[in-house]
Amino acid sequence: MSEQFIQFPQIDPIIFSLGPISLRWYGLMYLIGFAFAYWLGMKRAKASGGVWNGEQVDQLLYTGFWGVVLGGRVGDVLFYSFDRFLQDPLFLFRIWEGGMSFHGGLIGVIVAMIWVSYRQQRSFWQTADFIAPLIPFGLGMGRIGNFINDELWGRVTDVPWAVLFPSGGYLPRHPSQLYEFLLEGVVLFGILNAFIKKPRPMGSVAGLFLVGYGVFRFVVEYVRDIDPNVNTAADLITRGQLLSLPMIVGGVGVMLWAYRSNKAE
């Protein structure tokens, strides 16, 4: 029966090692995502008519990078592994044993944007609108890293494109990482970068990002395997969906406020 499904490609998560230092596919995917965001950010800065310059983009992306790393790790521990953290506080620092949470990373980036906006004496929403279209590609690369790592796979299914993941018991499962790559990485990137081709009210781009990611993540959670460490309300809604709902509601609220209060930029 397993022959009708797709065998997971056996890929070593470590590309190469030099002594104690190893380069992993997961880390490389994030580096590619960050490099692309840097390139696109510089390109947009040159086209901004002096609103942004290279030094300001450097500061924003550097600070945002640490917001993603620190917020993502703390969020993963608090949202998904809090019981383990209480038993072993040093688990927080062992990133290779747990991973990072998008929602925690988002909180970290928001804190970073508040600080950068203050330093650059500009509106928070101007900063958020600038960085929002840079994010999806990196998210997509992160999901490719999850796929290579044989983690965060989907629920058992009999669809023809089901994948037999080794760590998933070689049961046919939804390749939910690839669904998220397509929706959060490709489709959301296309939507946001098409949206900004015309002048938009301040805050509307950030609001659209929140709605888009929240909706896509909420939908994919229906086929993504439930984290055994997380208890949800009668298994009717996952932790990821609970965390995505405020994004959707908040994003709609931001867009309504933006179109009612601000002029197109």
From Swiss-Prot:
Transmembrane segments: 14-34, 60-80, 95-115, 176-196, 203-223, 236-256
Keywords, ordered alphabetically: Cell inner membrane, Cell membrane, Membrane, Transferase, Transmembrane, Transmembrane helix
Entry's localization field: Cell inner membrane
GO BP, sorted A to Z: lipoprotein biosynthetic process
EC assignment: 2.5.1.145
Pathway: Protein modification; lipoprotein biosynthesis (diacylglyceryl transfer)
Binding residues annotated for a 1,2-diacyl-sn-glycero-3-phospho-(1'-sn-glycerol), in chain numbering: 143
GO molecular function terms attached to this record: phosphatidylglycerol-prolipoprotein diacylglyceryl transferase activity
Regions annotated as coiled coil: none
PROSITE patterns listed in its UniProt record: LGT (PS01311)
Entries under Pfam families matching the protein: LGT
NCBIfam families, per database record: lgt
Role played: Catalyzes the transfer of the diacylglyceryl group from phosphatidylglycerol to the sulfhydryl group of the N-terminal cysteine of a prolipoprotein, the first step in the formation of mature lipoproteins.
Protein name: Phosphatidylglycerol--prolipoprotein diacylglyceryl transferase
Lineage: Bacteria, Pseudomonadati, Pseudomonadota, Gammaproteobacteria, Pasteurellales
